[in-house]
A protein has these predicted regions:
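Hydrophobic core positions within HEAT/HEAT-like alpha-solenoid repeats
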Residues: 54-55, 91-92, 109, 123-124, ...
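Short inter-helical turns and helix N-cap capping residues of alpha-solenoid HEAT/ARM repeat scaffolds
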Residues: 46-47, 83-84, 115-116, 147, ...
Length: 270
């Protein structure tokens, strides 16, 4: 496959991965911002959602080659290290809109080491458009369940129920330690698959409290990306979704089958 053909393939695949995400974000941040408002929101350090809104608007402008967006590129690179997980998450997606910017590419590569699972995953997905498969392990991790661990030794005073839908950062459990109550939160959006300990149990710091399965959107995006960059090592993670699952639509199963087929075809063509 020639370099040009490979880039075209990556570009088409990126659109497949990107469009569901942009549709979802538009339901939250769809209100169009004027140039003045965009500038105001992007610099509103007291309201992270305003910065997110501005980044989504910038992403849309970048996709339309709006020259106004370019003057904010240095700030987008800076936002890659913002303390807010939500801002870093959105920033990773936005930077994937212009693959001609080496600074974006470098920032996204650094974000593969971000402490937040979803930021790492979104950076990896964005890198696909650059023709860069460096984030493949992070994309595979988007297909895997996440463990929720006890933040400290103490008494488990509250837990979510199995089957509960939860957003990234959603409360899973509370642990009482001395006079303090500490919270254990979900690292991803999905559904509580398992709760390991009952309320009232004594738990040690780092003990597994619950398991959260990834949600539909996350799984869909990861499978689409692996359709393009997946390797034989990824087949076990993909195969899990080839079986019918009550909490996921049939399109996930169908995409998993297509992804496995694409990976095996690449193996045969080598």
């Amino acid at each position: 496959m020639s370099f040009r053909t490979r880039l075209l393939f990556f570009g088409i695949a990126w659109l497949i991965v990107l469009m569901p995400f942009l549709f979802w974000w538009s339901t939250w941040f769809g209100r169009q911002l004027s140039d003045a408002k965009l500038n105001e929101y992007l610099h509103d350090v007291n309201k992270p959602r305003h910065i997110q809104h501005a980044l989504v608007q910038l992403s849309d402008r970048m996709s339309r080659n709006d020259p106004v967006a370019k003057k904010y590129y240095p700030e987008m690179v800076t936002l890659a290290s913002n303390p807010s997980v939500e801002i870093r998450n959105t920033d990773a997606w936005a930077m994937g809109q212009d693959t001609t910017v080496p600074e974006f590419h470098q920032a996204l590569l650094k974000m593969l080491q971000d402490p937040a699972l979803m930021v790492r995953g979104n950076a990896a997905l964005a890198l696909v458009r650059f023709g860069d498969a460096s984030g493949r392990p992070q994309i595979v991790s988007l297909l895997q369940s996440a463990n929720v661990l006890a933040p400290a030794t103490g008494k488990l005073t509250d837990t979510a129920k199995p089957g509960t839908a939860v957003r990234e950062g959603g409360l899973i459990a509370k642990v009482q330690t001395g006079s303090q109550t500490l919270e254990a939160r979900s690292p991803l959006t999905g559904r509580v698959a398992l709760v390991n300990m009952p309320r009232g149990a004594e738990v040690a710091a780092g003990a597994q409290l619950a398991v959260v399965d990834p949600g539909e959107s996350q799984v869909w995006e990861a499978l689409r990306a692996l359709y393009v960059i997946g390797t034989p090592d990824d087949l076990p993670a993909v195969a899990r979704y080839e079986r019918e699952q009550p909490d996921l639509p049939d399109r996930i199963r169908q995409q998993a089958i297509l992804t496995e087929h694409a990976i095996r075809q690449r193996m045969e063509n080598k």
